[in-house]
Amino acid sequence: MPVAIINTIIEQAKTAPSGVNTQPWNVTVVTGKSKKNLSSLLEEAFRSEKKPTMGCGYYPTEWKGEYKARRKACGLLMYSTLGITREDKQRQLDQWAANYRAFDAPVMLLFFIDKVMEVGSYMDYGMFLQSIMLSAVEYGLSTCPQAALGKYPDLVRQELFYSKDRKLVCGMVLGYEDKSSTINSYRAPCEELNNMVRYFP
């Protein structure tokens, strides 16, 4: 993928708003041999059941109520789309392991933030991430944001030598969608509007 396109996408996304213009984002673009090496390290760590050391808390420590139900429904729908049964643990494992190869896309984006930044900056970061995703569509590209790519920051530091003053927030896949791939027909359901919005006229 041309570097010029990647640069243009990030150039457009960097106009995302941030509190007092802090612009807390820092991006590393990983391709080619570097991506292959890092993907191998991450997948090996996952398959060997290495304990994740994610620098940023992402999921709740205890799943409850509607969040637990949505998570379960999401997994069941994804596996049923792929024809993976509850009993087929190996195929489930292989599907999850693909996360660490960035689903074999040509570009892996990794996102870092200075350790001094607080919760508000992560909100800013979300706007930046979605701006990248929307900008990519303009160039016929697809994306997939991934928390999984942030689970082994020590291995990422080993390969990419990023500063100890920074945290690895997450990653993102960037590439051309394979429309013939079954997984790309999967869409997670969204809640009805009346379950998430209240009006006070």
Locations of the language-model features?
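Acidic, surface-exposed loops and disordered segments
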Residues: 1-201
